[in-house]
């Protein structure tokens, strides 16, 4: 048991990944702003990493966007969603931005 607590503690200390990417979704309230892990301090943020061109990823991002909008309209504005895909699949970006209002970013790092 102590081994798992130690691993969890190490993850909390050293497992902090930070990124900042431009929001490419024109219907998002953060459009063209650099969003990432540090952009929403003291808020719950879901970071969804997937492929713009895969049907499963597109469907899941749509479901998460629906949940994000439901929570926001219910007064839970402390919950945020950011979708991140690979830049080499930019021609399928519309799969995630059409009918979705959450920020969508493209990871430029290979």
Model-derived features: where do they sit?
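Conserved redox-active cysteine motifs that mediate thiol-disulfide chemistry
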Residues: 41-66
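Serine-centered coil/turn micro-motif
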Residues: 26-29, 54, 74
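Sec-dependent signal peptide recognition
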Residues: 1-9
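Short, glycine/acidic-enriched loop or turn micro-motifs at the edges of active sites
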Residues: 26, 51, 110
């Amino acid at each position: 048991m102590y081994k798992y607590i130690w691993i969890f503690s190490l993850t909390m200390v050293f497992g902090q990944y930070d990124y900042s990417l431009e929001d490419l979704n024109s219907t998002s309230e953060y459009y063209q702003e650099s969003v990432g892990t540090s952009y929403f301090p003291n808020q719950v943020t879901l970071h969804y990493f997937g492929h713009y061109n895969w049907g499963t990823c597109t469907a899941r991002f749509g479901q998460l966007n629906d949940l994000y909008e439901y929570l926001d309209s219910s007064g839970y504005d402390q919950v945020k969603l950011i979708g991140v895909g690979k830049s080499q699949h930019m021609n399928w970006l519309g799969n995630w931005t059409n009918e979705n209002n959450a920020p969508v970013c493209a990871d430029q790092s290979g």
